[in-house]
Amino acid sequence: MRSRDEKRVARDGGSRGAMAALAPSAAALAPLPPPTRARHRRVTTRASPVSVRSTAATSSLVAPVPDSDFGRVVDGPALLSLPHAERRAVLREALERGSGLVLVPNLAGISPRTLVELSYAVGDVVEKNPGVAPEYLIPNVPEVQVIGNVRDERGALRAMFSRAPPLPTDRITGAPTLRYDPELRSPVWHTDQAFRDPPPFASLLYCVKSPPAGAGGDTAFADMTAACNALDTNRREELRKLRAVCSYAHHNAKVNRRTPTYPLLTPNQRAAHPPVSQRIIRADPDTNTESLYGFSSAVCAVIDEKDEVTPEDLDRYDLLGEEDASVRALMYDELLPFATGAEFTYRHSWTEGDLVVWDNLRTIHTATPFDERYDREMWRTTVAHETGGEAYLGASIG
């Protein structure tokens, strides 16, 4: 039996053993209205217990991640052999038991359409990526976005690419660490598309090509339900009164600083995607389980639930990529370093054929850098809430 400290090291160290200031050139728009408050309405993406009731056979396919309380493992070939209803039962059970993280190995060689079929086993609305550049999508399968550094025969990128910064080093051991460093603003822990109302329910990321062992390219995940539960009761009560103002334009402006090929929003796109405010502590509508939420490059301010952001400040956040001091004080200096401790994190080292599914409302994740002499190609799908399949212009990088 491993000690708790040994388990923490295993979770932070890898998973191969477990699974063999730029501003847009366009003139500023007319002042935008204050951000809309995300409604957190009850949704039906998670099917009722009756429609996905597990059986002994399906439950036997769900196993713990070794040395971790976070995540579950489902064998890929066994999952593919099941009919749709049983696939859904297995994946839904694994998501619930795994705190929103599921690892599915041994799927090398599946087609993009098979990935879409698996995505429909997670939820009923798989998005078709409206607005994403066609070269970043699988031809004739618009649900699948390509992420990585792969190029076409002309040498042009055929994948959405964002360069992850180096990992910080532990101040005691000197080893790379996943714990967020407020000074370096690294790793780039985030939840996807917090600027949407409602945010997407889940994401699937499938490994087509991966750098060899030791060359980087891992993806790490953190359990925001466990982190929320570990907070002091009084602090949780204070956080329930706060909201994160999330802006799509602000997000793209910040990512563009690090990766100039990342697209900025046009004035029309900005007008079509106004900011929203999200609760810092988000309650699951089905179980009432609470999770920390809102860690995203889209967050430009943290406000009391009774306050609003002025249109002038929104222009500054969206057009100049600036953020209010409240973001650093709460999200970067306090919550992220706490929530990305080893006891809450899992690091996945990819093998070709691996699939990872995560609940976007209960987890955060981060990419890690890799040796760009090697190809890295990932396929990604996004599962929306049935009420939230609205247009957006791209996915963040895993």
Q: Where would I find each of the regions flagged by the language model?
A:
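N-terminal chloroplast transit peptides
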Residues: 1-2, 17-38
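Generic early N-terminus positional signal peaking at residue ~5-7
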Residues: 6, 24-25, 314
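Generic alpha-helix initiation/capping and coil-helix boundary signal
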Residues: 13-14, 112
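N-terminal mitochondrial targeting presequences
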Residues: 21, 43-59
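N-terminal processing/targeting junctions
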Residues: 28, 35-42, 111, 119, ...
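Fe(II)/2-oxoglutarate oxygenase catalytic core
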Residues: 57-99, 103-357, 361-398
